[in-house]
């Protein structure tokens, strides 16, 4: 899996620290063909999503498994999203810099209906077909879960499956 080259864009955005892996306690496991590669997606900016307890729990559980790797991705601010589109650079995991489209599974946290449009924006930036009927076996499985997923119908044409209840128990 090749890393996305995006560093040249950082000087052009308001808060570049949103897009680099500069956190304490991150696992730093590298996605590979020998394990299931998860990208945990939070459809809001880094400053909102990094403190979300549910993502932290799933991230820790998955990375403690021998045969799994979990990375994270957050919705970019419009300045960075625009540059990604202009430069034809796909949205990527914050730790590995691997394109989201190269992961096996992308799991979106559905905290509020207000972030549903951000999910579609993130799929577009990741160069993943929006409609589940347009995706094939080379595309990641798109999962959703969280409080706003209690009624999955509004997003059912975009997701492959939903987890109802606590993700760590699924």
Regions found by a protein language model. Give the residues of each.
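ER/secretory pathway lumenal C-terminal domains and tails of membrane proteins involved
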Residues: 2, 22-27, 60
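Low-complexity, highly charged intrinsically disordered N-terminal segments
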Residues: 38-43, 49-60, 64-84, 88, ...
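Sequence-level motif detector for i,i+2 pairs with an aromatic at +2
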Residues: 33-35, 139
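Glycine-rich beta-alpha loop elements in corrinoid/cobalamin-binding modules
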Residues: 75-170
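N-proximal accessory regions
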Residues: 2-8, 46, 123, 140-142
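Short boundary motifs at domain starts and secondary-structure transition points
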Residues: 23-33, 96-98
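Short acidic, S/G/P-rich loop/turn micro-motifs used as interaction or catalytic elements
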Residues: 45-48, 113-115
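Helix-enriched interaction subdomains in cytosolic or periplasmic regions
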Residues: 1-16, 65
């Amino acid at each position: 899996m090749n890393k996305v080259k995006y560093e040249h864009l950082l000087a052009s955005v308001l808060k570049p620290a949103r897009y680099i892996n500069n956190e304490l306690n991150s696992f730093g496991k590298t996605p590979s063909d020998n394990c299931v590669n998860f990208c945990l997606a939070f459809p809001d900016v880094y400053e909102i999503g990094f403190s979300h307890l549910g993502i932290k729990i799933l991230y820790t559980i998955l990375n403690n498994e021998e045969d799994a790797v979990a990375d994270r991705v957050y919705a970019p601010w419009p300045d960075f999203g625009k540059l990604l589109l202009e430069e034809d650079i796909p949205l990527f995991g914050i730790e590995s810099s691997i394109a989201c489209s190269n992961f096996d599974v992308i799991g979106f946290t559905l905290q509020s209906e207000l972030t549903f449009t951000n999910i579609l924006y993130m799929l577009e930036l990741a160069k993943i077909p929006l409609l589940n009927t347009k995706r094939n076996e080379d595309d990641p499985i798109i999962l959703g879960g969280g409080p706003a997923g209690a009624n999955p119908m509004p997003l059912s044409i975009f997701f492959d499956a939903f987890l109802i209840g606590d993700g760590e128990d699924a």
